[in-house]
Amino acid sequence: MDGNNSNSQGKCPVMHGGNTASEGDVMAWWPRALNLEILHQKDTKPNPMGDGPSYHEALKSLDFDALKTDMHALLTDSQDWWPADYGHYGGLMIRLAWHSAGSYRLADGRGGGGSGNIRFAPLNSWPDNGNLDKARRLLWPLKKKYGNKISWADLILLAGTIAYENMGLKTFGFGFGREDIWGPEIDTYWGAEKEWLAPSDTRYEDVAKPDTMENPLAAVQMGLIYVNPEGVNGKPDPLKTAAQVRTTFARMAMNDEETAALTAGGHTVGKTHGNGDAGALGPEPEGAELENQGFGWVNPNLGGKASNAVTSGLEGAWTTNPTQFDMGYFELLFGYEWELKKSPAGAQQWQPINIKPEHMPVDASDPSQRRMPIMTDADMAMKMDPAYRAICEKFMADPAYFKDTFARAWFKLTHRDMGPKDCYFGPDVPSEELVWQDPVPAGPTGYDVARVKSAIAASGLSIAEMVATAWDSARTFRGSDKRGGANGARIRLAPQKDWDGNEPDRLAKVLGVLEPIARDAGASLADVIVLAGNVGIEQAARAAGHDVAVPFSPGRGDATDAMTDAESFDVLEPLADGYRNWQKADYVVSAEEMLLDRTQLLGLTAPEMTVLVGGMRVLGTNYGGTKHGVFTDREGALTTDFFVNLTDMAYSWVPVDRRTYEIRDRKTGKARWTATRADLVFGSNSILRAYAEVYAQDDNAGKFVADFVAAWTKVMNADRFDLA
């Protein structure tokens, strides 16, 4: 019960001290505090499967054919509690899959359908995801039947793919392997708005300039997947909408042709729902009453008829045959002139002028009745925008090309955040390598690793050069969409070789030394770069009195320029790296927040972040050789000096400017060291200080080295999906 409840209801007779409501979060008192919880959201404790067999192991026993057969049957098995449009759930399942995958954004790789996140807040309650809770409940019998052998994430995206197959499309393929999460993804920033569908102005510097949308966002309003179907801020104007569509889809890594194909193919089947009063709907799933059992948007006027459903507020199908994948979208869009009308729910939509009765789709519940088709403002953009129109005309002239382009774009949409093909499972994985999958060839494994390490050690490279280069190669990894990382040695290719954060001159020098070593040994450069980092760490550990061997698994390959979509790699360029105490520019976001974001994308925990930063500082790996945070007189030795001096009360910390500090002797006032916010946060934040104190203890020097090596190896192997 609410301890602040002062109304007539009785108070709980037992003192209720559990912080069970979200508004009781203890950190709500300090909203600017670092949210370290984003580093631990995938803790195994909330996972009911515990340490049992992995999902990928369970997949091996899945009867794929039986599941697909059952899925086909489900699509036409209409249920009274949520009747199917036209007796077919295909449109609903496609929308579920689309909206699950469509939250992906290229900038940080977050969102997307790879984790089943649409089951949880906020996505399960976004206005744009209205009534998709019904689609998930329709899939429950299949999830119940096949159990641990199929994740929700896979099942949802498979449902959309099978729906297209059932309605006549030859799909490009399907990869299983998405693992479910068990709670909301609290690391993802969806926007600053505090209300659903707040005007776009909040997230744009200038709504008239779509490229001014706040990064990393990829949707025009809070609670939408892409654009407002009624137009910019709900005001129809196809050309303005076209500009927003272009930017929105580009932020999902889609070009104009893929965007036009997805728009047309997505609206070839299914319908919109707005035949009623949207104000009569119940609250979204997260706000619904207990007895609704997770059902949101309850419609008191449904009456068992699909044609009475209300979702987006728009009402009608796009094509004459909404359960067939055909060319009907283009035939209607380009075959008629269109005018603005309002749906029964009051939404702005486009309707054809003087349409022939035989071109009108039948009613979703009563096939004896015909209804007016509709187009959204985004559909009209395909006709009015010159570039989109030219693409659509190309599709109309070559239906086979359109269907293949759409099938490939759908595959990309539903697999974009899965990572390389090593992460795909099942009988329908396409054999074709696609450049957006960031392919990497298999690397050699039979070479003499010890010989390579000896050659590196004798090369004259410094510890800092070796460790920094290996780190820079691996730090691009993003667990969000499984891109980046050391495998492929793309650090030697454009654009990475020219990134400021990679110190191109230093990088070229190091690669010039390592490349002949790799060549002579028959090893990949990717492996040798990582080995060089390991050699540097082993040398530094010995200098501190610890004899360690850093684990290493050969087999990384070297990607080529032809395997690399250079433009799509631009988003992986680090703007800051707290591990190397570097920022490309002065940002509004603090250095410690950017460090936290990098850490989360790398899949590291707060203790791992702590030990890595402390170790990297004493190894002298700072960008440009700066001395910020190098709290040691033994640079190059893997000691705990960073933590010892950070926690020593003999020193005070004095700001020099907004970003840097001096560490001064309290008695003499003499400056001893300098630091950045990315250093001092480990003494300021109470949680991080607790970790720092562990490593500052006299008895934990050995633990520090062991923990550093383990965290380092985790980063170096983050993209080694072939080892799983």
From Swiss-Prot:
InterPro entries: Catalase_peroxidase, Haem_peroxidase, Haem_peroxidase_sf, Peroxidases_AS. Heme b binds at residue 267. It catalyses: H2O2 + AH2 = A + 2 H2O; 2 H2O2 = O2 + 2 H2O. CDD domains: catalase_peroxidase_2. There is a cross-link at residues 98-226 (Tryptophyl-tyrosyl-methioninium (Trp-Tyr) (with M-252)). GO terms for molecular function: catalase activity; heme binding; metal ion binding. Keywords: Heme, Hydrogen peroxide, Iron, Metal-binding, Oxidoreductase, Peroxidase. GO terms for cellular component: cytosol. Its cofactor is heme b. There is a cross-link at residues 226-252 (Tryptophyl-tyrosyl-methioninium (Tyr-Met) (with W-98)). It holds the Pfam family peroxidase. The record marks 95 as: Transition state stabilizer. It comes from the Bacteria. Binds 1 heme b (iron(II)-protoporphyrin IX) group per dimer. The active site is at residue 99. GO terms for biological process: cellular response to hydrogen peroxide; hydrogen peroxide catabolic process. Formation of the three residue Trp-Tyr-Met cross-link is important for the catalase, but not the peroxidase activity of the enzyme. Its EC number is 1.11.1.21. Homodimer or homotetramer. Belongs to the peroxidase family. Peroxidase/catalase subfamily. Bifunctional enzyme with both catalase and broad-spectrum peroxidase activity. This is Catalase-peroxidase. It comes from Maricaulis maris (strain MCS10).
